[in-house]
């Protein structure tokens, strides 16, 4: 039995594995781009299949493709979407910057599978052509950016945003639950005036709420599709209604608000929509990194750190120190945030490097974008499930640190002035006294006045958490 078969493209014949659906151009790419291990993301492959499915339907409706061929292409695309042909898409991220080879990989797989569905024999009889039928009314230059936007929007809506909302809700519940716990604040890693633990966490909640708004603000641009622009944005070789109809069809089959891009030249020449959307993801990464760092600092200890909160003990933390437990969820989250920030640099460089009518950094851009979405979504889910929901206050430690803080002296500013208050704090620190003892020793106020004026619970403003 033959292990290879001959496939042809415009450059001639080439042997491909007999058991594979791909054709000549995919094989050439496999042989010419054996670079690293990163493959085209499955979600991008599925977005390409969705795009081809929608195009076949619209081409049929416009009388440009027979019902028989269109139906076979759609059935083949549905098989790809069901995961039946995942091993038919082996191409590397590091290929042509337009994604042409992955577009042709999809065209060849769908054409060969559709031909089989129509009774053809693989490698012997082509009833559906990869270019003339599957790629009808299309160019790689508008197909690949369309698939990028489809994959990106669906990932943001279905993966990232739900996890962001869940984590925000968890922290909001913690903020409300801890609204009456007065603790010492810290600025510059030094003691500061008091606030409540609920107020502190409310800041985290507000950060995430702003991140959600920024991400949602970017979605309409991502929902704009390049399909119909063909090679350079002019729409050469397309029906006048094709672009609008294919965007409408994609909106229907994905239940997402896709529209045809109002300017196809921008849609082909830039990656601006994903650059801007990823900027919002970078902002989310910055916020999550700050939150994770705060959590692990507040939970540091258990005896020699800040120790104001406890977090779940999920696994042993050391191979040499018995009983040690580390803030591993915080560490995982901060690492992935660093990766997202690195991805943002690469996406910015790729987005800025397009020339004339086409950006040719697209595979790298979408690879990094989808990785960032996946990392952030998975990271938030893990952090929420294994850390945030289990945050609990250590009230005894909180009260100890609060009562030992010299910054409670700030409450005296309006009564005896900044200079005298500072003198009290310095004397207390230098001589190891309490603030009250130092104040009384200096004779600046009476014991009754100190007890009346230095009351931490009255120094936090509204006891509400700012929600």
Curated annotation (Swiss-Prot):
GO cellular component: cytoplasm
Reactions the enzyme catalyzes: (S)-malate = fumarate + H2O
CDD domains per UniProt: Fumarase_classII
Active site: 188 (proton donor/acceptor), 318
Enzyme class per UniProt: lyase
Disulfides per UniProt: none
Disruption phenotype: Cells lacking this gene show an increase of biofilm formation.
Any Pfam family hit: FumaraseC_C
Result of altering residue 188 to N: 200-fold decrease of fumarase activity
One GO MF term attached to the UniProt entry: fumarate hydratase activity
Record's note on what induces expression: Under conditions of iron limitation and oxidative stress.
InterPro entries given in the database record: Fum_hydII (IPR005677), Fumarase/histidase_N (IPR024083), Fumarase_C_C (IPR018951), Fumarate_lyase_CS (IPR020557), Fumarate_lyase_fam (IPR000362), Fumarate_lyase_N (IPR022761), L-Aspartase-like (IPR008948)
HAMAP family from the UniProt entry: FumaraseC
Miscellaneous section: There are 2 substrate-binding sites: the catalytic A site, and the non-catalytic B site that may play a role in the transfer of substrate or product between the active site and the solvent. Alternatively, the B site may bind allosteric effectors.
Subunit structure: Homotetramer.
Family: Belongs to the class-II fumarase/aspartase family. Fumarase subfamily.
Protein name: Fumarate hydratase class II
Organism whose genome encodes this protein: Escherichia coli (strain K12)
């Amino acid at each position: 039995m033959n292990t290879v078969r001959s496939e042809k493209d415009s450059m001639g014949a080439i042997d491909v594995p007999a058991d594979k659906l791909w054709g000549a151009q995919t094989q050439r790419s496999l042989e010419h781009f054996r670079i690293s291990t990163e493959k085209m993301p499955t979600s991008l492959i599925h977005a390409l299949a969705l795009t081809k499915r929608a195009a076949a339907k619209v081409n049929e409706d416009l009388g440009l493709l027979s019902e028989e061929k269109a139906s076979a292409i759609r059935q083949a695309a549905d098989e790809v979407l069901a995961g039946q042909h995942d091993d038919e898409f082996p191409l590397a991220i590091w290929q042509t910057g337009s994604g042409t080879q992955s577009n042709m990989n999809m065209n060849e797989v769908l054409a060969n599978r559709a031909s089989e569905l129509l009774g053809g024999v693989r490698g012997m009889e082509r009833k559906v052509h990869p270019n003339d039928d599957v790629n009808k009314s299309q160019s790689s230059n508008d197909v690949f950016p369309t698939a990028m936007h489809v994959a990106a929007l669906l990932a943001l809506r279905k993966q990232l945003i739900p996890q962001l909302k869940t984590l925000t809700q968890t922290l909001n519940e913690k903020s409300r639950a801890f609204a009456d716990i007065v603790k010492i604040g810290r600025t510059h890693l030094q003691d500061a005036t008091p606030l409540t633990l609920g107020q502190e966490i409310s800041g985290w909640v507000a950060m995430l709420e702003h991140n959600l708004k920024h991400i949602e603000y970017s979605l309409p641009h991502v929902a704009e599709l390049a399909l119909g622009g063909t090679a350079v944005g002019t729409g050469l070789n397309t029906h006048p209604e094709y672009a609008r109809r294919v965007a409408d069809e994609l909106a229907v089959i994905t239940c997402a608000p896709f529209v045809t891009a109002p300017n196809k030249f921008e849609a082909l020449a830039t990656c601006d929509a994903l650059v801007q959307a990823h900027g919002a993801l970078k902002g989310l990464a910055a916020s999550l990194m700050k939150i994770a760092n705060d959590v692990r600092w507040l939970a540091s200890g258990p005896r020699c750190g800040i120790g104001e909160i406890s977090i779940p003990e999920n696994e042993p933390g050391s191979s040499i120190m018995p009983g040690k437990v580390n803030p591993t969820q915080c560490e995982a989250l901060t690492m992935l945030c660093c990766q997202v920030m690195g991805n943002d640099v690469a996406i910015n460089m790729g987005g800025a490097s397009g020339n004339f009518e086409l950006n040719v950094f697209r595979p790298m851009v979408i690879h990094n974008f989808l990785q960032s979405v996946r990392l952030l979504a998975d990271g938030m889910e893990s952090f929420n499930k294994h850390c945030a929901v289990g945050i609990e206050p250590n009230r005894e430690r909180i009260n100890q640190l609060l009562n030992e803080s010299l910054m409670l002296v700030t409450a005296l500013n309006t009564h005896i002035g900044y200079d005298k208050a500072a003198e009290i704090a310095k004397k207390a620190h230098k001589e190891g006294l309490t603030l009250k003892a130092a104040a009384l020793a200096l004779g600046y106020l009476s014991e009754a006045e100190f007890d009346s004026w230095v009351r931490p619970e009255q120094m936090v403003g509204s006891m509400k958490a700012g929600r």
